[in-house]
Structures are given as C-alpha cells and as structure tokens.
Amino acid sequence: MNPLLTLILLASLCAGCVHTYTAKSISRSGVLRTNATALVSLPEDGRFENIVYPGSGRKTALAVSKAFAKQLRTVDVTPQAGALSQHLEQARAGRFDYLIVPTVVHWEDRATEWSGRPDRIEIEIRAVDVPSEKTLSLGSVAGKSKWATFGGDVPEDLLDLPLGMYIDWLFAPDGTPLPQPRAEPEQTMTRPTGKGR
C-alpha cells in the first residue's frame, strides 16, 4: 500500500478515537469574584431537528452549577425554566450576586457504536450581575464524541472538561488567555481547581 495513503488512513482512524472540545469567549467585561454567590437558571431542554431530549436542560444546569461551585461560595439552580426577567427576580429575592444563564444550543445523542455518527453538544453560558442586570461574560463550550466506541456515551459526558476550563478562566486575571481543551481519548485531563485565585 502507498505509505502516504497508509498515514492518512491511520490519522483518520486516530481522530475517531478521541473526544474533541472547544471553548469560546464572546465577551468578558471583568473577573468574577470567588466570594460571590450565583443562581443558575434551568434552560429549556435541548433538541436536534425534531427530537427533544427530556431532562437535558436539567443535566446542563447541574453540570454548570457543579463547575461554578468549585469557585463560588454558594451556587443554586432554579426549579424550572423561564424568562430571564423571572430568573432575575428569583436571584434578587435570594440575594444572589450573579445569575448564570446556560442555553442548550445543540444536543445530539447518537447510537455512535453502530451509526458512526458522534454525539454533539454546545452550551452557551451568560453571567449576569444581578444588581445592575449587566452581562459580565458570554461564551460557549462544545464537544463531539469519538466514533470508535462500544456504546454508553451520552452528550452530557462531553461537558465537564470544556465547562470547567471555561468557568475557571472567568475567575482568572484580565489578560489570561482562554485555554483550549485538548482532544482526549477519555476525560482524564487534569486542570487547576479550588478557590485560591
């Protein structure tokens, strides 16, 4: 076989053996405070084409709250989805400093083990200062599963790594570049955690 063709085939096979992630900042006006509190709004369930994935909104909110809880003093989640104005009222009533608004942009759960089509997920995260109602940051994270799998993968498994890196970065000093998650066979990348920044 042609050596070049062999290399191309091997590279394409290796690419299918890893999850891939991205984290993107759209806007950021300052550093979030670690001694603050936050309310995470429950987003609407994700969908792909005409398929709605029940419970995906709650899974997203829990993943976002878990990541913010590593940095903030207190984090809670709203009991149901609703309008931004409604969630701001709840945040004010609960004396929260920040309202975190995740939105499920894309949620695609595939039987990858036999279809070869990967799971995909994209979440937008907005951080709002409750007293001023000003948006402090807006960004998104995304993940695509490996296609070489024996099954059991679900889209929410792709959230922890890029979410953690993006949310940790919101507490980093101004000028700190947003790190990009590397493609990993499994979600084993370690990253700095804790509230000492």
Regions found by a protein language model. Give the residues of each.
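Generic short beta-strand segments
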Residues: P43-D45, T103-E108, A142
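A structural "domain/chain start" motif
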Residues: G16-L72, F171-R197
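Second-shell loop/turn segments in exported
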Residues: G46-G55, E113, A148-D153
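Stable alpha-helical elements in mature extracytoplasmic
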Residues: S56, T60, V64, H87, ...
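Surface-exposed short loop/turn segments
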Residues: V18-H19, G82-L136
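Short secondary-structure boundary motifs at beta->alpha junctions and helix caps
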Residues: E122, V128-R182, E186
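Sec-dependent bacterial lipoprotein signal peptides
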Residues: M1-C17
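Short beta-strand->alpha-helix linker/helix-N-cap micro-motif
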Residues: S65-E89
